[in-house]
Amino acid sequence: MSATPVTQLTPSSQPQQPCSPLLGASVTELTSWVQQQGQPAYRGKQLHDWIYHKGVRSLTDISVFSKQWRAAVADVPIGRSTIHHRSVASDGTVKYLLQLSDGEIVEAVGIPTDKRLTVCVSTQVGCPMACDFCATGKGGYKRNLERHEIVDQVLTVQEDFQQRVSHVVFMGMGEPLLNTENVLAGLRSLNQDVGIGQRSLTLSTVGIRDRISELAEHHLQVTLAVSLHAPNQALREQLIPSARSYHIEDLLAECREYVAITGRRISFEYILLAGVNDLPEHALELSKHLRGFQNHVNLIPYNSIDEVDYKRPSGDRIQAFLTVLQQQHIAVSVRYSRGLEADAACGQLRTKASR
């Protein structure tokens, strides 16, 4: 699909300041900035091409600019990270620990499948949600990622694979809807600057009150994935502490509103935990919540981690859960995580370097 413009996510009318990282800026912003520096407007498009398509990491390396001007802006950061560590799984999945300018480490994952290359990106350093089954939340929360730090993850994976990224999922470290401004800016840049179609971008959230409704107002064509993980409020509170302040019925009401406004189907993520939320009666209860609006359920068999005692259900238990949903006419599939040897699968995005 072509890169449909995110018309509701327009670039800032204010030009980039000279000392701000340039990655994430639109061609309009870059043009304004180069003109501030006394350069002709066409240099903005050239700069845009070098940043997003030629992988330049320093303005001093842009050969089409004069040596004098390159020297004058040598200290202006583009905003690229460095690869701190790289792990490769037998299925070709690659996990990256990326070091940011302040020394913090975030994780990104490159997932090759056939002719596609999907990147799983982080939106925060750590995560404040502290979901009971998730490795990332066990490490605490540091800060939000800036827009350039989000876009950089995609460019880094693309350059390392030497293959064009086709899809991006915001399912790494952090809760995207607690960093809405930078996430929306990152979505805009990935769509309009990097050239990835909106429908190839997936935004995942555990559910933050009112944020899904606010997202709907942008009328985006991105895919929204909601981490549900339980069929009722009591069990969801056990697994997701933040659910105590956001009832499952309120969350689902926002989801229905989102579908009505955008016309886009919602994906519901459901991690299967042995003996916890994987019984046939859980599947039946879940199905009752999902009738009457467009949705799809991704069942994710759990990936065990050292810090918690949850286990993956047996194949028979997974199939039984799947069958109940299918019998209730719920669109459903099982998603088996990639990159287990690299600790890169869903729920295992954790920085070993911080241990």
From Swiss-Prot:
InterPro entries, per database record: Aldolase_TIM, Methyltransferase_A, RlmN_N, RNA_MTrfase_RlmN, rRNA_lsu_MTrfase_RlmN/Cfr, rSAM
GO biological process: rRNA base methylation; tRNA methylation
Annotated spans, Disordered: 1-20
Claim: Iron-sulfur is one of the keywords in the record: yes
Disulfide cross-links: C120-C346
Keyword presence, Chloroplast: no
This enzyme's EC code(s): 2.1.1.192
UniProt keyword annotations, A-Z: 4Fe-4S, Cytoplasm, Disulfide bond, Iron, Iron-sulfur, Metal-binding, Methyltransferase, rRNA processing, S-adenosyl-L-methionine, Transferase, tRNA processing
The Radical SAM core domain, residue ranges: 113-341
Superkingdom of origin organism: Bacteria
Residues where [4Fe-4S] cluster binds: C127, C131, C134
Residues that bind S-adenosyl-L-methionine: G174, E175, S204, S227, L228, H229, N303
UniProt function note: Specifically methylates position 2 of adenine 2503 in 23S rRNA and position 2 of adenine 37 in tRNAs.
Entry-linked HAMAP family: RNA_methyltr_RlmN
Family to which the UniProt record says this protein belongs: Belongs to the radical SAM superfamily. RlmN family.
Matches recorded under NCBIfam families: rRNA_mod_RlmN (TIGR00048)
Protein name as catalogued: Probable dual-specificity RNA methyltransferase RlmN
Species annotation: Nostoc sp. (strain PCC 7120 / SAG 25.82 / UTEX 2576)
Lineage of source species: Bacteria, Bacillati, Cyanobacteriota, Cyanophyceae, Nostocales
